[in-house]
Amino acid sequence: MDPKAYSEAVAALVGARHSNPFAFLGPHEGRAEGGRGGFCIRCFRPKATAVSLISAADDTVLGRMKRLHPDGLFGIDLPEAPGALAYRLRVSEGDEDRDIEDPYRFGPVLGELDRHLLGEGTHLDIYRKMGAHPMTRDGVRGTGFALWAPNATRVSVIGDFNGWDGRLHPMRAHPGSGVWDIFLPGVVEGHLYKYELLGPDGSLLPAKADPYAFQAEKPPHTASVVRGLGTYAWNDGRWMSERADRVATSAPVSIYEVHLGSWRHGGGDRSLSYREMAEQLIPYVKEMGFTHIELLPVSEFPFDGSWGYQPIGLFAPTSRFGEPDDFRHFVDRCHQEGVGVILDWVAGHFPEDAHGLSWFDGTHLYEHSDPRQGRHMDWGTYIFNYGRNEVRNFLLANALFWLEQFHIDGLRVDAVASMLYLDYSRKAGEWVPNKFGGRENLEAIDFLRRMNELVYGRFPGAVTIAEESTAWPMVSRPVHLGGLGFGYKWNMGWMNDTLSYMSQDPIYRRFHQHDLSFGLLYAFTENFVLPLSHDEVVHGKRSILGRMPGDAWQQFANLRAYYGFMWTHPGKKLLFMGCEFAQGREWNHNASLDWHLLDIDWHKGVQALVRDLNGLYAGVPALHDRDTEGYGFSWIDCTDADQSVLAFLRFGETAEDVVMVVCNFTPNPRHGYRLGAPIAGRWREIFNTDSAHYGGSNMGNSVVETEETKSHGHAQSVVLTLPPLATIVLRPDGPITRIA
C-alpha cells in the first residue's frame, strides 16, 4: 500500500467513514504502516491503551502491537504470511485486560450465490442469510450480520456488546449487490443491536433496527435482539396433515378475530402473554365453536395505537407478549386443539419511524422516491416499491417465513385495494399512471400473484385472504386463470350494506330491502368471507350492538336476528372479539374486553347464540357445503319489503339436504305467513334466534306440515309464525314425500 493510500485509509477509518474496512483491518500483505513487503495485522480499538497479538493455540504472546494512530489504530508486522493463523487480541482498556477475537480475520457471511439471488429477487429463504444469525466459525461462537443498504457509504453493527460505538465494527461491503456483512465473535443470543449507517453524502443517519431481525426489544425500546431461528419441537403433525380440509370452500370456516393486547388482561391491566393466551384463549375459542383465530398483526410495531398495522420488524413476533418460541407454543397449542391460526399481514405500507425502513440508507430504498407513488397521505406511511427486486424478495420471503417458521395456517393481506390502485385515495394530479396510462399498480399485482403462487405451492393447506374493498375482478381465482390467486376475499360490500340496513329503524327498513338482497347478485363471483371486523367497532362507528335501533330489548333482538342471517348467508364467517357477547362500547385497544357483561342475561344470551350458530353452521352441511357456489342457494322470497321479511333456501350435496331460512326484521310477529317449500312433508324448526335461551320471546313453530298449496314456485307450502326481530331455520323432518 503506497503512503497516500495508507494515509487515506487511516483517515477514513479513524473518522468512521471507511467503506471497506476488511481491506485494511485484520491480516494483510504489506507492512502495518503501509510499506511494501512482508505481512501485517491491524486492529482499531479507540479505547485501548495497548494491544497484543495472542496465539489461540497456546495463549502465548506473539508480539505487542504498535500504536499507528493516537485514535486507536494498532498494527504488527509478521515475519511470514498469517495463513491459517488463529489468533486473538489482548486488549488493555483502563485497568482491564481481556482477550477478544478479531472480526476482521473471518471471511464473508454471505456467499456470491446468495447475493446474486437477492439481486434477482428470487432468494425465497433470504431470511436465513440476512439479518443476525448465531453461528460458529473456525470453532469461534458469534453472530453473522448481513444488511442490504446499497447507497450507504459505511455500515456498522452497534450494540450493547460494543458500547453502541459505530467505529468498532464497520461491515464488509460487497460492491454490486449492496450487501454488507460481518461475523462478530462473542455476540450471542439476547444481545441488543442496531445498524449505524452513513448516507451517500457521508452524513450520519438515525440508527436502524434490523429489517430481518427475529426479535426486537419490547416497545417503546427499538433495538433488535440477536435471536436464531431456533429448534422448536412441534407437536402439530396431525393438524398440519389435515388442515387443508379445515379451510376448504366446502368447510364450515368460522373465524374469531383477536387483538392479543386487549382480549383479556391479567392483574393490573397487564396484557396476557403468548403462553397465557394459550391457556385461556384457545379453550374459549373451542367452546365457542370457532374454527380459526385471526390475529391482528403480530409483526413488531412501535405504536400501540396502530394495532400492528404499521409494522417495522416484519420477521419478529412482537415482544409485548413474549419471545418467538412463546408464540410458536401458542400456535402449536392451537393446532393440537384443532384450531387454525391466521395472521393479518401488512405488505402495503410501513411507518415513517426513524429506526425503521424509511429513508433506510439515506435514499428511498424500500419506498418510491416520488411521493405520488411512495406515500399514503391519509395514513402518513410509505408504500413499498414492489418493482425493486430486493424489496419484493424481502416481502415474499416474509410471507413464507411465517408459514414455515411458525406453522401459520393463513395470511389475511391487509389493505389490498391500496396496493392495486395507483390513484387510491388520491385526487387528479396526485398519482402517476402505469406504463399503459392506467391506474392499476402493475408491480403490486405481479407481487400479489407471485406471493399467492408461492404460498399455495409451498405450503399445502395454507390459505390467503384479501381485504379488498373494490370490485376488482377474480381476486380469489387462480393466477393461471387471470386471478390474483387468493383463497378468499372479505365481502366488504355485504358488510357495509347489511350494517346500513340493520341501523335503520324497522319502520323504514321497507325502503332498504335491497341492502340485504343485493349481495346475492355477486355472492358467488368470489370465495367470500363475511367480516364483522375490528374496523367496524372503532372511530365513532359504535359497537355492533350500538348500531342496532330501538330500546334494549329491540337492540339485542336485532343483533340476534342479524347474526342468524349472517351465519345462514353464503360465505365464511368472521367475528371480532367482544361482538360474540354484544359488547356495548367501542373497542379500546388499551383496555380488556368487558367480560363482566356476561353477568347480564342478555349478553350471556348473545354469547350462547353465537356458540350455537357455530354449531349449526358446522353441523348442517347445507349451510357450508356450497358456501361459494350459486347452486347452494335459492331465494324463496326477497321481495316482501313491506313486511321486511326475507326467505331463502340453502342446499348441500343432495336434493334432500336443504334448509329454509326466514328472517323477520320488524318487531311485529307474523302469523300465518305462507312460504313455498321445495319438499313436501314435515319441516322442523332447528334454530330460532328468538328462543328464550338467547333472551328472546320464545315464539316459534316447532314442527309444521306442508300444505298442497302452490306458493313461490313450489307445489307445496308451509304456514309459519315469524317471531319478532328474529331469524328461524327449518329443515325436512321425517319421510320425504315429494320434491318439487
UniProtKB/Swiss-Prot annotation:
Active site per UniProt: 414 (nucleophile), 467 (proton donor)
GO biological process, one term: glycogen biosynthetic process
Pfam families in UniProt: Alpha-amylase (PF00128), Alpha-amylase_C (PF02806), CBM_48 (PF02922), GlgB_N (PF22019)
Protein name per UniProt: 1,4-alpha-glucan branching enzyme GlgB
HAMAP family to which the protein is assigned, alphabetical: GlgB
Gene Ontology molecular functions: 1,4-alpha-glucan branching enzyme activity; cation binding; hydrolase activity, hydrolyzing O-glycosyl compounds
SUPFAM superfamilies xrefs: (Trans)glycosidases, E set domains, Glycosyl hydrolase domain
Quaternary organization: Monomer.
Similarity section: Belongs to the glycosyl hydrolase 13 family. GlgB subfamily.
PANTHER family: 1,4-ALPHA-GLUCAN-BRANCHING ENZYME
Role of this protein: Catalyzes the formation of the alpha-1,6-glucosidic linkages in glycogen by scission of a 1,4-alpha-linked oligosaccharide from growing alpha-1,4-glucan chains and the subsequent attachment of the oligosaccharide to the alpha-1,6 position.
Presence of the UniProt keyword Transport in the record: no
Enzymatic reactions: Transfers a segment of a (1->4)-alpha-D-glucan chain to a primary hydroxy group in a similar glucan chain
UniProt keyword list: Carbohydrate metabolism, Glycogen biosynthesis, Glycogen metabolism, Glycosyltransferase, Transferase
CDD domains registered for this protein in UniProt: AmyAc_Glg_BE, E_set_GBE_prok_N
The protein's enzyme class: transferase
Gene: glgB
Pathway(s) per entry: Glycan biosynthesis; glycogen biosynthesis
EC number from the UniProt entry: 2.4.1.18
